[in-house]
């Protein structure tokens, strides 16, 4: 009788240990580098948008972006991935006039690759978006804050 309870207890303990096993250090290091790259790309885009020489900023601010209600986990990166196409279109407006945003397509492409590495190929996560939309600067700032938060937990 006690043997069955002991085996059940051991099985439960093994499941708990397996589910809470830490990521290997090389995997953590790679994730840190990918998060840092994503953070740098977002900051670069924000700097280009906020550049005082950007004649299209007022026009860019009229476009609205969706942000998740609460972005706290890697699965929320799916929400960013879903908005990247819209971001690329808006950032493409001033390309001919704004030196700081000339490599938009390459940056967005790099971000897509980085996001795929970070979140994996799993796309079944459905984003719950905030009721209010965000301007391009609010959108970028929110994702920068998210990346900084995740990055700080990794280091």
Curated annotation (Swiss-Prot):
Pfam families reported for this sequence: IL2 (PF00715)
Keywords for this protein: Adaptive immunity, Cytokine, Disulfide bond, Glycoprotein, Growth factor, Immunity, Secreted, Signal
Location of this chain's protein in the cell: Secreted
Biological processes, Gene Ontology terms: activated T cell proliferation; adaptive immune response; cell surface receptor signaling pathway via STAT; extrinsic apoptotic signaling pathway in absence of ligand; interleukin-2-mediated signaling pathway; leukocyte activation involved in immune response; negative regulation of B cell apoptotic process; negative regulation of inflammatory response
Known glycosylation sites: 24, 112
Cysteine-cysteine disulfides: 79-127
Similarity remark: Belongs to the IL-2 family.
Name of the featured protein: Interleukin-2
Organism: Vulpes vulpes
